[in-house]
Amino acid sequence: HPGALPVLNKRAVELALQLGLALGADYDRYATSGGLHIKFDRKNYFYPDLPKGYQITQFDEPIVPGGAVEFPFEGGTKRVGITRAHLEGDAGKLTHPEGKDYSLVDLNRAETPLLEIVSEPDMRSPQEAKAYAQELHNLARYSGASDANLYYGNMRFDVNVSVRPVGQKEFGTRTETKNLNSFKAVEKAAEYEIRRQIVLVEHGDQVKQETRGWNEAKQQTYAMRSKEDADEYRYFPEPDLPPLVITPTMVAQAKAEVGLLPNDLRAETSSAKLPAAEAEVLISDPASALIWHKTVTIDQRQARFALGWLVGDKVRLAQDTGLPVESSSVTPAVLAEVGLMVAGGSLSSTNAKALLEHFYAPNVKGSPAEAAKAKSLLQESNEDELAVVVDNVINAHAQAAADYQAGNQ
């Protein structure tokens, strides 16, 4: 509306703090001065996806003042520093129809809150960049900051690439390839830019500092516009948004919302001596990873059984039914009980899959032991032995049994 002024989105600030904590930002060091002081600025440039001619962003006092991300890579651990992360209003979306002499502008996402993470130049290969992007995707979801759905553009990646001759200390001129929406695109765009820039340097040509796009069909980057330096954006404080102090209370509230993070789960799966590759598949799905963690909290002995089902049969069931595991009746208590029945010999591995498939639906009543008996899934045994098995399973999970009897799933 004409004359409308911007208003800071409180929820965006809260979610940015949650992700900032997951990125390793040290907010505690600002506590003695009352908290972290942040402000907003105008970034001035002309482009069709920015109708106002400027973007509200943060220049020198961002909401995430730094941090670092550590993740497994090629048998070791890779560390990438976080320069900063700042809140800003998103720009529109440009699309370039193949073979046409025009572009289309979609402004539906314009001015929606965006947190831009700026990384240190710590990556040395396209594969490292891809692994780092995957870990950022994990952290965005585990922190509760975003569902980070790549298909819908809820998380996008800009890849900065420069090359330099062996032995040269200074970085070369960089390009920025914008708005990549898949991990594969991150890797392929970086590979293409490296090849392109090496050819230029080896032929004595200069690499232009520019913003580039990614053509998925051709698997090539293409020039979009020259890349400005910071002073060319003519930053100045946003007059319509007052500065803000991120107080220790706000930080404490954000910490309460951030639960387990990927490296916490890596430590747990490593302690349980689980295969690293399968553990990474589990960790890539926060809902499944949380179920695994809670299952192991109930019964540590079920770590391997729970992992096997969550990265195996569960994936098939989720695809077949369209039901996410967290919406099914396969709770940690159910998974632990089924695992105990398998370990105790009363249930075969094949029948355990059938039993868990029975529970892979909303609001399934009864305990696994009761369902197994009703469906004749238990190993053949006389009635006395069967009663002992059922009693042992129920006694081992007395609280879970009480919850079922009370009607709680």
Task: Explain the meaning of each model-derived region.
Residues 1-260, 266, 270, 276, ...:
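Basic, nucleic-acid-interacting segments
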Residues 11-15, 128-131, 185-189, 260, ...:
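Generic recognition of stable, solvent-exposed alpha-helical segments in well-folded globular domains
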Residues 326-336, 346-409:
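Strongly charged, low-complexity linkers/loops
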